[in-house]
């Protein structure tokens, strides 16, 4: 009841952001109502059971001390007949069983799937420094070659001849990014501490995870259809079957997550620190930025001089001879 009031009467701001449309709010309320029904059913069952025990009815042996039901039963059902009490006890039992089974079936359609996914997601959370991006083998090998250094030793793949950097769609994200999206509880703690969101920008880390999950489900439904219309044109053929490697429906994550949103991110890691189940909304944002910069040569105009300076002089300030000067103040390890 308290949590329902927080969402619907007090209306805490993090529960009423733009991405919290009718369905996410209804989903949360349905679960809370189900929990209220479950607790009510258990209390009814145990309260009636307690009174039946006191009456010495057959098939109702002592179950031990029940602090709430032991007080509630005599208060509610004192003077009731045994037949009515048995009916109430059975009603409570069936009601709690149906709520539990209904909840299990509903889980696959609800954000409350995180009940099962929170532990594995936490277990597989990255242990390296937060905000650190993984290197791209193709680029690292090119850089090593340019600098006359030996190759990193990572094997070349078939896609290395025409690589795609970053993530345009869910196929460019890792399995952990997808797991993060399905583990999201939509609690809004990440968005509540996001400095970009707090200053009125459109970025909401929670919305990013919700959009990834929704896009994943959309792609999965189309893949399951097996329709040839979703096969990329240059991959179509007589015996070609639809799969994630040749999938193309003309849409992408950028149709859900705008450039304005991903460019508003300051990479401060506040969202990562705030998540109770160690979801990392920053990584998919950075992967989408990679695609935007490396594949489409897009980005805010303010970023262009920085990239040009890095390319020409290896320093954002275009002073290559002084770029390592700051290290002179550090003690040798």
Describe these PLM feature segments.
Residues 212-214:
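Short, glycine/proline-biased beta-turn/loop segments that scaffold the active-site neighborhood
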Residues 131-202, 311, 315-331:
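Non-transmembrane accessory domains of multi-pass membrane transporters/channels
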Residues 22-23, 29, 86-94, 173-185, ...:
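Flexible gly/pro/ser-rich segments immediately N-terminal to CXXCH heme-c attachment motifs
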Residues 83-86, 104-108, 176, 182, ...:
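Catalytic cores of large soluble enzymes that bind and process phosphate-bearing ligands
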Residues 2, 105, 113-114, 191-193, ...:
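Beta-sheet entry/capping signal
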Residues 2, 9, 172-175, 181, ...:
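Iron-sulfur-cluster electron-transfer modules
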Residues 84, 101, 175-177, 189-196, ...:
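Glycine- and acidic
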Residues 1-154, 206, 210:
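Membrane-embedded alpha-helical bundles of multi-pass integral membrane proteins
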């Amino acid at each position: 009841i308290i949590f329902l009031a927080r969402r619907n009467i007090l209306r805490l701001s993090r529960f009423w952001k733009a991405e919290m449309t009718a369905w996410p709010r209804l989903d949360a309320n349905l679960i809370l109502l189900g929990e209220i029904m479950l607790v009510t059913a258990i209390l009814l069952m145990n309260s009636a059971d307690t009174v039946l025990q006191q009456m010495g009815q057959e098939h109702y042996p002592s179950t031990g001390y029940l602090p709430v039901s032991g007080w509630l039963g005599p208060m509610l059902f004192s003077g009731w007949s045994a037949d009515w009490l048995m009916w109430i006890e059975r009603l409570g039992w069936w009601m709690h069983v149906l709520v539990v089974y209904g909840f299990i079936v509903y889980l696959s359609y609800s954000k409350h799937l995180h009940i099962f996914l929170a532990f594995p997601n936490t277990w597989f959370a990255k242990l390296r420094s937060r905000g650190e991006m993984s290197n791209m083998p193709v680029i690292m090998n090119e850089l090593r070659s340019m600098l006359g250094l030996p190759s990193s030793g990572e094997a070349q793949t078939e896609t290395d001849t025409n690589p795609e950097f970053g993530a345009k769609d869910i196929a460019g994200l890792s399995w952990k990014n997808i797991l993060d999206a399905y583990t999201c509880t939509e609690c809004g703690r990440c968005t509540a501490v996001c400095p970009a969101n707090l200053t009125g920008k459109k970025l909401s880390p929670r919305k990013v995870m919700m959009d990834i999950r929704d896009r994943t489900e959309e792609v999965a439904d189309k893949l399951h259809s097996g329709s040839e219309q979703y096969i990329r044109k240059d991959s179509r053929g007589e015996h070609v079957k639809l799969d994630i490697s040749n999938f193309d429906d003309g849409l992408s994550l950028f149709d859900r997550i705008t450039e304005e949103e991903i460019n508003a991110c300051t990479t401060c890691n506040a969202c990562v620190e705030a998540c109770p189940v160690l979801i990392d909304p920053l990584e998919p944002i950075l992967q989408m930025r990679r695609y935007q910069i490396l594949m489409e040569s897009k980005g805010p105009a303010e970023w262009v001089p920085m990239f040009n300076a890095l390319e020409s002089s290896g320093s954002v300030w275009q002073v290559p001879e002084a770029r390592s000067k700051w290290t002179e103040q550090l003690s040798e390890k």
